[in-house]
UniProtKB/Swiss-Prot annotation:
GO MF, one example: structural constituent of ribosome
InterPro entries (UniProt xref): Ribosomal_bL17 (IPR000456), Ribosomal_bL17_CS (IPR047859), Ribosomal_bL17_sf (IPR036373)
Keywords of the record: Ribonucleoprotein, Ribosomal protein
The protein, known as: Large ribosomal subunit protein bL17
Keyword Methyltransferase annotated: no
Superkingdom, taxonomy of origin: Bacteria
GO biological process, one term: translation
Biological classification of the source: Bacteria, Bacillati, Actinomycetota, Actinomycetes, Mycobacteriales
Annotated S-S bridges: none
Amino acid sequence: MPKPKKGARFGGSASHQKAIFANLATALFEHGRITTTEAKAKAVRPYAEKLITKAKAGTLADRREVLKVIRNKDVVHSLFAEIGPSFEGREGGYTRITKTLPRKGDNAPMAIIELVREKTVTNEADRARRVAASKKAEEQAPAAEAEEQAPAAEAEAPAADAAAEAKADEAAEDKKDA
């Protein structure tokens, strides 16, 4: 039989904690960023990211699952129409937590949790690097084949040697141009 996790819950009871997370996630999707305590921000992060992952899929079943948690239909619509598709190329990491100054009244550690809107530069750079490497490998493969064929051609005929050298020179020039 599964046992509940030990330790205090936000709000005291399980139902109150569930309501707190639902309200925090609703506010996050509605406004894009919220200021809350550091503990609540860290706790609501996986909760919100799972909802965004469901919004990325965009199926009717996923929409109904999200509606069980977030009761505001306008927020659910914006989650599925705008927020989910904007994270289409990203595999997780939809939110960012930034620590801020402590709260004035009780000195509680505060944080801002926000949706990450900008595209990742590293993914685009990695993709460009992989494309360049694959093009370079494709260009080197015909040149390597031409070099392998050249020794066999030398043994057969000297005329074939000149043709192989011409092919290798053309491949080298094409590589320089690219």
